[in-house]
Structures are given as C-alpha cells and as structure tokens.
Amino acid sequence: MSRSLLILDRDGVINLDSDDYIKTLDEWIPIPSSIEAIARLSQAGWTVAVATNQSGIARGYYDLAVLEAMHARLRELVAEQGGEVGLIVYCPHGPDDGCDCRKPKPGMLRQIGEHYGVDLSGIWFVGDSIGDLEAARAVDCQPVLVKTGKGVRTLGKPLPEGTLIFDDLAAVASALLQ
C-alpha cells in the first residue's frame, strides 16, 4: 500500500489558487489535466489523498458546507474520469491558532498515514509551497514541488534537500506511472 499512496496539497496543485482564497464553489476551478491525472493514478491502483490548509474557515471567508461542496465537486469530477479520491483532510485553523495540523506542521500527513496504516517514509507529498515541502520533510515523505499555483514563486526559495520538481500534477502522474 505505501508505494501506491500519493498525498496532494489542494489549492495550487489540484485547483487554481488565489491569494484572496477560494471562497465559493464557483471559484474552485481545477487546473487543466489535474483531474485526469488523479483519475489515471487511481485507475492504476494508487490511493490519492489530500491534505489542505483551509484557514479561510477560521477567517470567516467561507464555512464548512462550502468546503465540503468543493470536495464533493472534486470527487465527482474524478469519478466522471473513472477514478477515486481517497481521504481528504483539512486544517480549518488560522496561522496563529497554534494547532498541530496546519502545514508546515505535519499533523494532516500523520493523520493520513494513520488512516491507511502506513509508514510515511518515502511517500510522495506534492505541493506548491515551502510549507508543503517542510511538512513532507517533517515525516520523511518525499517532497515534490509542482510549478502550478505558488510553485514558481517557491522555486525562488531554498528548497528542502532532495525535493523533486515537476511542471504540474499530470507530469507527476506520468513519472509515477512509468
């Protein structure tokens, strides 16, 4: 199972990101080819889980019902392509709330590992920010940076040692399915 578990950040990896937050279902727009990439991985036997910071809830920009609608849309679009999305975990807290789940802390990644009963060592965690990559390193996941979302900006910062870099999630899927 561990070799076939992939963990993804959401905003900037699966869907377009915004510095103003994704606040409505209409603003949740998949990155071209990301839905197909998840479906391809799922069809090949991969479990694709999601770990996403959603501080917009703590900030009052949207509520849990809106977040759940976005995740239902994600699951629906992937299912239409013949795939499945695994566990989706989110941190609803703000940056100053002192929780253990908000990336770069690795709480959400640990939760996914516990859910699937796997050691996270070597599991790929795909993100577009330094926080994603640092969370990956904290639990010995393989940090993977995509150039979508904030990825190009992130390239200008010091990356954790051994970070793999891909153009987008479709390129990650192609590499894993070779």
From Swiss-Prot:
GO terms for molecular function: D-glycero-beta-D-manno-heptose 1,7-bisphosphate 7-phosphatase activity; magnesium ion binding; zinc ion binding. The record marks R102 as: Contributes to substrate recognition. The active site is at D9, D11. Its EC number is 3.1.3.82. SUPFAM superfamilies: HAD-like. One of its GO terms (biological process) is ADP-L-glycero-beta-D-manno-heptose biosynthetic process. Zn(2+) binds at C91, H93, C99, C101. Monomer. This is D-glycero-beta-D-manno-heptose-1,7-bisphosphate 7-phosphatase. It comes from Pseudomonas aeruginosa (strain ATCC 15692 / DSM 22644 / CIP 104116 / JCM 14847 / LMG 12228 / 1C / PRS 101 / PAO1).
